[in-house]
Design a protein with these regions (language model features):
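A short beta-strand signature within small-molecule sensing/ligand-binding domains used
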Residues: 110, 187-189, 337-339, 347-357
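Membrane-interface helix-start motif
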Residues: 6-7, 372-381
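Juxtamembrane membrane-water interface segments immediately C-terminal to a transmembrane helix
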Residues: 26-48, 71
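A short, hydrophobic, proline-anchored segment that marks a local hinge/packing element in signaling
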Residues: 205-207, 344, 353-362
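Soluble sensory domains of the PAS superfamily and closely related sensory modules
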Residues: 320-339
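Structural preference for beta-rich elements and adjacent junctions enriched in aromatics
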Residues: 51, 58-322
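Sensory beta-strand/linker motifs that couple input domains to effectors
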Residues: 366-370
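Extreme N-terminal signal-anchor transmembrane helix of membrane signaling/transducer proteins, especially
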Residues: 1-26
Length: 381
């Protein structure tokens, strides 16, 4: 073979190298994505299978599993990192207003609520819009006769009403507003009543054990008419005889169970069958450093670049009323395990979320969501 032919063959070979390199990189990218998706999906499926054997962990009260969703009436109380100081001010609350209720006729009074649980205690931050606050006057009657708040729980299939009333702003404790339930002390419900520019605020703490996993509340506005013309705002009312709406909060048994499955760099979440967050566990990532990651820099840059070209969805944060949104969650609650990529807040990083349905009694009773970012997976490869 003469020199000219040899040069032609070498030139052709060199021309194929970029194409071969691109093919190699593409196959590597596909393998990385498939590997991460399979690993995260397997984790979600394993947790879902474990929880399927313990439906009581998701639903301590099985009756809630059989009832329809009530996003307007039910109260959602997420887990709090620390208990708030009961002083009637909202600066101790990280969450925004989770829901509000108002009088149908005049829109006043209006009741806004925040709720959270910590250490077996339910905390409430209630803000009432009232054009004219009327305080209880002990000289008129021992029974509350001014503006007040009613709490309604449900124990042993019977309701228990409590009233919060005061002659002046300051510390408050509940009183019975209906026949007393045996073994329940109204004084366990305590808090602080504070005047506000719009009306008043009441910050309360009460044991979860006395709620029966249901809670109704409504503000009573007497508006200067102590014997007539009352207006109310809340998720229940004085004439309601049925059980109050559900109080939805993370069951401690479920939180403990979920923490056992958390792997470094993964966030685990469990929702009920309506998509409301019931438990969450996050294990700190290991093996990651921003400046001196051991992962081969070219592989890291490649994975970021290829994901950036294909991932366009932003991850929605949990709503104040507890609902989680996402393509994979919708599919899991419909009975199908799915993975989906999202953009991350961190530059160049992306988030993989895999969801699997939790099945029980022949139906989907919830979903398990496992999240892991792309950088954490690369550190493990």
């Amino acid at each position: 073979m003469n020199l000219r032919r040899q040069l032609v063959l070498v030139s052709l070979l060199l021309l194929t190298l970029p194409w071969a390199g691109c093919q190699f990189l593409r196959e590597m990218e596909i393998a990385l994505r498939q590997g991460q998706a399979q690993a995260v999906a397997a984790a979600a499926t394993a947790v879902a299978a474990s929880l399927a054997e313990r439906p009581d962990a998701l639903y301590p009260n099985r009756e809630r599993l059989r009832t329809a969703d009530d996003p307007e009436g039910s109260l959602y109380a997420p887990m709090l990192d620390s208990p708030p100081l009961l002083d009637g001010y909202e600066d101790g609350w990280d969450t925004s207003i989770q829901g509000h209720y108002s009088s149908l006729e005049t829109r006043v009074p209006r009741l806004d609520y925040r709720a959270g649980v910590h250490g077996g205690t339910l905390y409430l931050m209630l803000q009432v819009t009232d054009e004219s606050v009327t305080y209880h006057d002990p000289g008129l009657s021992p029974e509350p006769n001014g503006d007040r708040l009613i709490l309604r729980t449900w124990l042993d299939n019977r309701r228990q009403d409590y009233v919060i009333a005061t002659p002046a702003p300051g510390s408050v404790r509940a009183q019975y507003a209906s026949p007393r339930h045996p073994g329940v002390d109204a004084g366990q419900i305590r808090g602080f009543w504070q005047d506000t520019r719009e009306g008043y605020a009441i910050e309360l703490a009460l044991p979860l054990s006395i709620t029966g996993q249901r809670l109704g509340l409504y503000a009573v506005d007497v508006d200067g008419h102590r014997s007539s013309g009352w207006r109310t705002a809340g998720n229940t009312g004085p004439l309601d005889l049925t059980a109050p709406p559900w109080l939805i909060y993370p069951p401690q048994a479920l939180q403990t169970e979920l923490a056992r499955f958390a792997q470094p760099g993964q966030r685990l979440r469990v929702t009920d069958r309506h998509g409301r967050l019931l438990a969450e566990a996050l294990a700190p990532a290991t093996g990651l450093a921003d400046d001196d990651d051991d992962t081969f820099w070219l592989l890291q840059a490649l994975y970021r670049r290829l994901l950036a070209e294909e991932v366009t969805d932003d991850r929605a944060a949990p709503q104040g009323n507890g609902y989680l949104q996402g393509t994979e969650i919708t599919a899991a609650l419909a009975g199908t395990a799915v993975e989906h990529w999202y953009r991350s807040d961190s530059a160049g990083r992306h988030l993989l979320a895999a969801a699997a349905p939790v099945r029980g009694a022949g139906q989907v009773i919830g979903a398990v969501v496992v999240e892991q970012n792309s950088e954490q997976y690369l550190s493990l490869t």
